[in-house]
């Protein structure tokens, strides 16, 4: 669980990021969950976008993906949201989040 101060730091880092995943009109299935897990393992902090034609809104998609991957939801704004999952070793954000 992130504190509000840690969440603010991560929001600042995610501000300039482009979305790496897009939630479309299909279900959030195992393939997408595995792709998000792989991306979180590589980057720790990712931004995702939900299309207007999706059956989910950004809040619903963020909750579902955060639960499925074990990540923390950092921010939800409009159709975009940010997820964070700290690496066990060599975390890029560990020093910032102390």
Describe each region flagged by the PLM.
Residues 1-98:
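Positively charged, polar, low-complexity stretches
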